């Protein structure tokens, strides 16, 4: 299929050129930008619906504001693809999320038009406030605009930032992109007229004069005057909550109508007051019928056919780890009505959508609020329930204080299923699950597990369900399982006990997580080179299986620990035990294979693991290096 024809977009490769276009050309430019976006994502995959919803808003922002001098911060960044196309990156846009290509999120090192990197939600207002205050301190005059979705506004951090911005009376513009909850839908021409009126210079100068007069009144009359003005505007336009936080509220307005957007943005740009919140209502997937009809299915997409909207998904050889978790938890919940499930706005991503279909009264989606999710789970556990608080590894970082203070110190039996453990590929370093083993295994009394395959995951779900002595976690990766046979229900694992998968005599490979398959492949290659190799599945990073580690250390010349996590995790705990137990005193050759001490850019997971030395070849090379020998070529192909 040929690429769309885009004569106006071709003339506007950067915002300076866009600002030279007459306003009458902008609707056509938006249409061309939308067509380009659909064509791009159909070939690369990625986040489509959010970007389609902000096409007109993106065009309007870059037309009205002097970027990059003025700062635009996109919360999360899923919606930033149109922004990338308009800011000098169109020639590389078809490398999106590919190895060596453009990031799927905003990234400071990628463009001067990306003043702040993003990928986790609800950070834009805090970052924008910092930039606004920095501008004031430096004596510079610039506009700072934070664009945040209504979903991100469910996180407490956004309100913390707004409260601070209101107290500072900072010159900050927040655009609330309301594309899902429809907090207050626009009501046509009257809504647009009122929004334009209250954002204009005349109204605001009169308002400012009234405020100066009010300052001469007794305080109780000042408060009454302020409240009267706020509620009068709120009667027509809404926004009382934001006014209470110290923001001047404008909206709601139609985010797809440039005739409404442009004058309001200009009014706000030209005022000296702040902070201001502009409430813009948009539609996810706008302008592409399949995405409009099923916004949830077009949030993140694989490559797809533009005509039909059908996504191309390679056939799976095994069910996904996420699905195995969801179905396993359903099975356990049938045996125990105290089991409840908690997600922080990721029901389908964590597999809890399946659980919710069977047990809707026992499923809780708390929104983008990981801190609350963890302490909410702690409260449930304190009353005898068995909460499974399912959060991606990267997002669990957001609730770590609650894990320590509210769960671990009180030794409450909260279960933490940790999805997206290890490298996640196209989403890059912001979404990699690198650190959970390290930050959880450091906590006294915390049980930390990792599944080596889908059957082990099923066992760990049951083990967690029946473990009541304290907090417990189990991690598993994105993607499909390896195709092992699955029991109908998991087995109960002995806490702190691993397993020997293959017996050998010379080399021992101790795996924590799904690198077990690579360890087995490495053992085949080592065996072909005359090095008999034991392969063990640790299962637990805490408590460690001391007996297993002693056996591996005493009966082998080389011990290699392999994990899909950062330095400071499983291997570090094993090394400390080896040293404390005196097992390093007899000449044991030890190597620890972890993720590198850097943030790996996005790419294909297999290639990223190979780069990290965590594939078969990397493991084999580590063994030969420990022995002081050159690796020999394998007699078989990968």
Curated annotation (Swiss-Prot):
Its cofactor is Mg(2+); thiamine diphosphate. Pfam families: DXP_synthase_N, Transket_pyr, Transketolase_C. This is 1-deoxy-D-xylulose-5-phosphate synthase. Homodimer. GO terms for molecular function: 1-deoxy-D-xylulose-5-phosphate synthase activity; magnesium ion binding; thiamine pyrophosphate binding. Mg(2+) binds at residues 150, 179. Its EC number is 2.2.1.7. Belongs to the transketolase family. DXPS subfamily. Catalyzes the acyloin condensation reaction between C atoms 2 and 3 of pyruvate and glyceraldehyde 3-phosphate to yield 1-deoxy-D-xylulose-5-phosphate (DXP). Binds 1 Mg(2+) ion per subunit. Binds 1 thiamine pyrophosphate per subunit. InterPro entries: Dxylulose-5-P_synthase, THDP-binding, Transketo_C/PFOR_II, Transketolase-like_Pyr-bd, Transketolase_BS, Transketolase_C, Transketolase_CS. Pathway: Metabolic intermediate biosynthesis; 1-deoxy-D-xylulose 5-phosphate biosynthesis; 1-deoxy-D-xylulose 5-phosphate from D-glyceraldehyde 3-phosphate and pyruvate: step 1/1. The gene is dxs. The keyword Metal-binding applies. It catalyses: D-glyceraldehyde 3-phosphate + pyruvate + H(+) = 1-deoxy-D-xylulose 5-phosphate + CO2. Thiamine diphosphate binds at residues 78, 119-121, 151-152, 179, 288, 370. HAMAP family: DXP_synth. GO terms for biological process: 1-deoxy-D-xylulose 5-phosphate biosynthetic process; glyceraldehyde-3-phosphate metabolic process; terpenoid biosynthetic process; thiamine biosynthetic process. Keywords: Isoprene biosynthesis, Magnesium, Metal-binding, Thiamine biosynthesis, Thiamine pyrophosphate, Transferase.
């Amino acid at each position: 299929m040929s690429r769309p024809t885009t004569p106006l977009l071709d003339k506007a490769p950067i915002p300076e050129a866009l600002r030279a276009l007459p306003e009458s050309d902008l609707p056509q430019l938006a249409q061309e930008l939308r067509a380009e976006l659909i064509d791009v994502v159909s070939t690369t995959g990625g986040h489509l619906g959010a970007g389609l919803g902000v096409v007109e808003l993106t065009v309007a922002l870059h037309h009205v504001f002097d970027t990059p001098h003025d700062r635009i911060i996109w919360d999360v960044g899923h919606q930033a693809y149109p922004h990338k196309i308009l800011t000098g990156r169109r020639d590389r846009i078809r490398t999106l999320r590919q190895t060596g290509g453009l990031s799927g999120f905003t990234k400071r090192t990628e463009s001067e038009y990306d003043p702040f990197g993003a990928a986790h939600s609800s950070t834009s207002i805090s970052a924008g406030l910092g930039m606004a205050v920095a501008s004031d301190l430096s004596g510079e005059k610039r506009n700072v605009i934070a664009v945040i979705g209504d979903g991100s506004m469910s996180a407490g951090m956004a309100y913390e930032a707004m409260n601070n911005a209101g107290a500072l009376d900072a010159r900050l513009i927040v655009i609330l992109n309301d594309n899902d909850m429809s907090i207050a839908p626009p009501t046509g021409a009257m809504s647009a007229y009122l929004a334009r009126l209250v954002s204009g210079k005349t109204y605001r100068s009169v308002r400012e004069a009234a405020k100066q007069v009010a300052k001469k009144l007794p305080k109780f009359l000042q408060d009454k005057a302020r409240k009267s003005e706020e509620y009068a505007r709120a009667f027509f336009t809404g926004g009382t909550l934001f006014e209470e936080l110290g923001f001047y509220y404008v909206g709601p307005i139609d985010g797809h109508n440039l005739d409404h957007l442009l004058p309001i943005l200009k009014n706000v740009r030209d005022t000296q007051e702040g902070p201001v919140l502009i409430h813009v209502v948009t539609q996810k997937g706008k302008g592409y019928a399949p995405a409009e009809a099923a916004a949830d299915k077009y949030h993140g997409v694989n490559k797809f056919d533009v005509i039909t909207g059908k996504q191309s998904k390679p056939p799976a050889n095994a069910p996904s780890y996420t699905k195995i978790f969801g179905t396993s938890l359903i099975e356990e919940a049938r045996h125990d009505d105290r089991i409840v499930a908690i997600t922080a706005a990721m029901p389908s991503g964590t597999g809890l959508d399946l659980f919710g279909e069977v047990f809707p009264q026992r499923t809780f989606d708390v929104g983008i609020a990981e801190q609350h999710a963890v302490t909410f789970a702690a409260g449930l556990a304190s009353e005898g329930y068995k909460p499974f608080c399912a959060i991606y590894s990267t997002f669990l970082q957001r609730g770590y204080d609650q894990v320590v203070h509210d769960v671990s110190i009180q030794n409450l039996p909260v279960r933490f299923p940790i999805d997206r453990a290890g490298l996640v590929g196209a989403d890059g370093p912001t979404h990699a699950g690198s650190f959970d083993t390290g930050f959880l295994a450091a906590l006294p009394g915390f049980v930390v597990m990792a599944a080596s395959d889908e059957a082990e995951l099923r066992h760990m779900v049951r083990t967690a369900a029946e473990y009541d002595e304290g907090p417990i976690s189990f991690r598993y990766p994105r993607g499909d399982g390896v195709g092992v046979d699955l029991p109908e229900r998991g087995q109960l694992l002995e806490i702190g006990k691993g397993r020997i998968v293959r017996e050998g005599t010379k080399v021992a490979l101790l795996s924590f997580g799904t690198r077990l398959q690579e360890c087995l492949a490495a053992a085949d290659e080592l065996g072909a080179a005359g090095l008999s190799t034991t392969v063990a599945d640790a299962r637990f990073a805490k408590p460690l299986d001391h007996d297993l580690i002693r056996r591996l250390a005493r009966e082998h010349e080389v011990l290699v620990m392999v994990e899909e996590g950062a330095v400071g995790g499983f291997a570090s705990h094993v090394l400390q035990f080896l040293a404390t137990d005196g097992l390093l005193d007899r000449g044991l050759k030890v190597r620890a294979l972890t993720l590198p001490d850097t943030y790996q850019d996005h790419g294909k997971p297999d290639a990223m693991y190979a780069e990290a030395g965590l594939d078969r070849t990397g493991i084999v090379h580590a063994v030969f290096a420990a022995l002081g020998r050159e690796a020999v070529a394998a007699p078989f192909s990968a």
